[in-house]
A protein has these predicted regions:
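HhH-family (HhH-GPD) DNA N-glycosylase catalytic core used in base-excision repair
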Residues: 2-199
Length: 199
């Protein structure tokens, strides 16, 4: 979600929050209630897998504004139901304006659901799979003071995205992977001065 070329133009903190969320009500609510909060539920992890993949090349706010459309289109983020979607259903989604109508991204959500289920079977949960990339098996809490310090990827996201690519996942490179890890609380990048900073 955070990109250096955009971040360089932002204030570090706005109203006591990480400056990337600005003052947009939806963005602020997302920042305060979700971003960086530890996620243990695989259904929520699948939701963010779909949403972060859809965001590739777009703004995160665009995807947040279409989130309910994605929820409807992708069976309330039930990975099993999405994995069973047919080519005909993919075609129907190309006519649904509640999501970004990009055939490759829609098809990747379906194939990624199948790979997600495979990972669950192998590791017991997708969360366990994600944590397998962390040296001590625990989330990372960074202590950045400025948005410009936050990287677009790190060794964990590099290794995880590389492994996911080998497993067949699409639209999930190192930068998208890092955003996913931030969003789901595996990496806490709330700035040290942010009111949502994990204590």
């Amino acid at each position: 979600m955070l990109r250096h070329n955009i971040v360089m133009l932002m204030e570090d903190l706005i109203n006591g929050r990480c400056g990337w969320c600005g003052t947009d009500r939806l963005y602020v609510e997302y920042h305060d209630r979700e971003w960086g909060k530890p996620t243990a539920d695989d259904k929520t992890l699948f939701e963010f897998l779909v949403l972060e993949s859809a965001q590739a090349g777009l703004s995160w706010l665009t995807i947040l504004r279409k989130r309910e459309g994605y929820r409807r289109a992708f069976r309330d983020f039930d990975a099993g139901a999405v994995a069973r979607m047919t080519e005909e259903e993919v075609g129907q989604l190309m006519r649904f304006d509640g999501i970004v109508r990009n055939r490759m991204k829609i098809e990747s959500a379906v194939s990624n659901a199948r790979h997600f289920l495979s990972v669950q079977r192998e590791f017991g949960s997708f969360r366990s799979y994600v944590l397998s990339f962390f040296p001590d098996g625990k989330p990372i809490v960074n202590r950045f003071r400025s948005l410009s310090e936050i990287p677009v990827s790190n060794p964990v996201s590099d290794a995880m995205s590389r492994d996911m690519k080998k497993r067949g996942f699409r639209f999930f490179g190192p930068t998208i992977c890092y955003s996913f890890l931030q969003a789901t609380g595996f990496i806490d990048d709330h700035l040290t001065g942010c009111i949502c900073r994990r204590k």
